[in-house]
Amino acid sequence: MRHISFKDSFFTVLLIVIASLAYNKRSTSAFIDYNEPGSYKVQALSIPTEIEFAGETIQLKEADLIERMDKELLVNTYWQSNTILMLKRAHKYFPQIEKILAEEGVPEDFKYLALIESGLENVTSSAGAKGFWQIMRTTGREYGLEVNANVDERYNIDLSTRVACKYLIKAKEKFGSWTLAAASYNRGMSGIKRLLEKQQSETYYDLL
């Protein structure tokens, strides 16, 4: 089995989602010739050389990352049922999330984090994380959410988004980077701290 590094996993998925939605927001005229009834073009997509996330420029130079990006862009462009569902949910919920991110001072790109975590659905993970932002019970209570047998505010989009913002701001203050803040949302602040110390790294991109 090929070794999968931390850097190959969560944040790579985040980049792929950002790039995929950017491509799919383009006009469908790139794939349909309206002058020729019934026409539909299937074509390879060019891979961007860099992506900007939360004001930080990310260079796409690693061969493995480029190959995975290429695969996911093609899948999400031509697997239209899945893409349409993602875009419909994004159209419905992103404005609500964007407003709160702006009020809390968190970059708008973090709306994609909720999409990755839950597909913008109130789901429950095998570990017990719940809601759009997949918040654990202890974390929710730590950040002021009411979580008990009768009420679970992790399912409240507004309240859970504000909790996610508080967490991300705290992580940004701790690590000095929105990229590391995003990575810590999945791995935990202590987990990222241990990785940075163990590998004597200062940035997300130096992690193996």
Language model features: what each stretch is:
Residues 1-105:
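An acidic, Gly/Ser/Thr/Pro-rich helix-cap/linker signature
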Residues 62-208:
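Catalytic glycan-binding domains that act on GlcNAc-containing polysaccharides
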